[in-house]
Design a protein with these regions (language model features):
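Active-site-proximal specificity loops/subdomain of glycosyltransferases
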Residues: 203-243
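Conserved donor-nucleotide/metal-binding helix-loop-beta segment in metal-dependent transferases, i.e.
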Residues: 257-284
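Catalytic core and acceptor-binding pocket of nucleotide-sugar-dependent glycosyltransferases
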Residues: 130, 294-355
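Start-of-helix register in tetratricopeptide repeats
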Residues: 36, 70, 103-106
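Short coil turns that delineate tetratricopeptide repeat
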Residues: 32, 66, 100-102, 135-136
């Protein structure tokens, strides 16, 4: 199951006037120039995974604006990545205090992860619940589709009607070989389901043949669908008229008997959708590779995704699928969903069944 990590805040500010006055030798324009330089250097270093360098730059920025929540959050994030958990905990708490009544949900994501590493179990649950509840609050005014008041049709064990959907692009063995392994495991774990891979021409032909040899469907996305991030391709299964139920999974995550037991519990329920959270870092409303549902609710998914992308309401391409699910799918899904949550983050969640 994908280990979903929090997003960088990336929000160093223009220096508040009161703080600039403490640096009388530096005028406001010069101060903002210095902050921008540190911010840009921090962002570049963090994107490259050089958190030691990112830390040096964001630390200098915090020295200039010590009470700014965004700067403190970025500092805590780099400390988290550097495994300086006590420092990260301190600065996340300072960032929350500096935020007043407007706390960024990402702060709770980071604190949940930090508390896990510090073995602060009760605080991990506390901040995990805040991470989930604040995201729910962010979506409360988003549009939703209607779900029929009746139960979904009973599950039929016809593998052609039940699809486990993956996106696959490129030749990286981490994704290609894991995908092939999943097709083998799915034959044993998910005999009532068929694996389907939405791919483009960057996937080696030999990989495609090996997937098909193991019973998987290989679907080449269209030229217009290619314009979307590959992370979205697997969602196209949602409006396939030949599909009755679907599961969305990550190409680099192994299917398991644990998740199958949870899926079977969903199939026996009267809920239209299913989602799972099974790690301390699972503080998003819908983990992009850990959910599923019944067909017939969402239509014209390609246009639905394009409409969301056009809004620009996401912090970066790495998490664009997560934010689409948060703002465009969750408001509908939440009306009828079975949530398996081993972390106790969701008040409506239940533990995973025995298997």
């Amino acid at each position: 199951l994908r280990n979903f990590t929090m997003k960088k805040t990336l929000s160093l500010p223009k220096a508040p006037i009161g703080m600039m006055n403490r640096h009388k030798k530096t005028n406001p324009a010069e101060m903002n120039k210095i902050l921008s330089q540190h911010f840009n250097a921090f962002k570049q270093a963090a994107a490259q995974g050089d958190y030691a360098k990112a830390y040096q730059h964001v630390k200098k920025a915090v020295n200039l604006v010590p009470q700014h929540s965004g700067a403190l959050s970025d500092l805590a994030y780099t400390e988290l990545r550097l495994r300086r958990y006590d420092d990260a905990y301190q600065h996340y708490m300072q960032a929350i205090k500096a935020s007043g009544s407007n706390v960024n949900t990402n702060l709770y994501d980071g604190l949940t992860e930090v508390c896990h590493h510090l073995n602060k179990k009760e605080e991990k649950i506390k901040f995990g619940r805040l991470a989930i509840s604040t995201k729910k609050e962010l979506t409360k005014n988003e549009p939703a589709l209607n779900i029929p008041p009746h139960k979904p049709v009973p599950f039929s064990p016809n593998p052609q009607e039940n699809i486990i959907a993956f996106s696959l692009f490129g030749a990286n063995p981490r994704y290609c070989e894991t995908s092939i392994l999943n097709t083998k495991l799915a034959q044993e774990i998910y005999p009532e389901w068929t694996c389907r891979f939405y791919i483009d021409d960057t996937v080696p032909e030999l990989v495609q043949k090996r997937l098909q040899a193991n019973g998987a469907q290989v679907v080449h996305v269209s030229s217009t669908q290619k314009q979307l991030s590959g992370l979205f391709w697997r969602f196209l299964v949602m409006d396939d008229p030949l599909v009755k139920r679907f599961l969305i999974r990550d190409a680099d995550s192994i299917v398991s008997y644990r998740e199958k037991a949870a899926v079977d519990a969903w199939l026996k329920s009267d809920q239209w959708f299913h989602l799972m959270r099974d790690s301390y870092s699972h503080t998003e409303l819908i983990l992009a590779g850990m959910w599923g549902g019944c067909s017939g609710i969402f239509h014209n998914i390609e246009a639905h995704v394009r409409d969301y992308v056009a809004t620009g309401k996401y912090p970066g391409n790495r998490v664009i699928d997560q934010h689409y699910l948060r703002y465009r799918v969750w408001p509908t899904l939440k009306q009828s969903v079975l949530v398996h949550d081993s972390q106790q983050f969701d008040e409506n969640g239940v533990d995973f069944p025995a298997y």
